[in-house]
Amino acid sequence: MSSQIRQNYSTEVEAAVNRLVNMHLRASYTYLSLGFYFDRDDVALEGVGHFFRELAEEKREGAERFLKMQNQRGGRALFQDVQKPSQDEWGKTLDAMEAALLLEKSLNQALLDLHALGSARADPHLCDFLENHFLDEEVKLIKKMGDHLTNLRRLATPQAGLGEYLFERLTLKHD
């Protein structure tokens, strides 16, 4: 059944939004895996785990924001299977942060592609939605992860375990 409120909302945009919902849910699932990996007793980097669990929540909220927008525009939310994270063992914080940065860059590219599609389909509402809720936040997160990687690489010495511990205590501290 078609929507009575749908206006200037192309089927290509609708499908791309559904794909982005899935990407955000997959990212949330991956960050949840990362968060609880670093919280294990044999890894014990609580601050790193907290950092990734917060990202899991942010990505889930992003998926919900897209779903609400989809309904407001008269689109239909079509859920797909959420792929499990690529691994269960994440290694050191440096390895995990590199994987997270790649994930965020792929999400950012998907957002940019959706923005370009919205521009091509003359959908100013979609472009405004992306600009106000996603694009700037994504760039800030990529910068933050890049900064964390720079500091983690500085600490990657023969005493890498000590460096990882100090990074976790000094950079990712939380109350």
Swiss-Prot record:
Stored Gene3D superfamilies: 1.20.1260.10
Region forming the signal peptide: none
PROSITE patterns: FERRITIN_1 (PS00540), FERRITIN_2 (PS00204), FERRITIN_LIKE (PS50905)
One GO cellular component, as annotated: cytoplasm
Cell location: Cytoplasmic vesicle, Autophagosome; Cytoplasm; Autolysosome
Molecular-function GO term, any one: ferric iron binding
One Pfam family recorded for the sequence: Ferritin
CDD domains recorded: Ferritin (cd00904)
Protein name as it appears in the record: Ferritin light chain
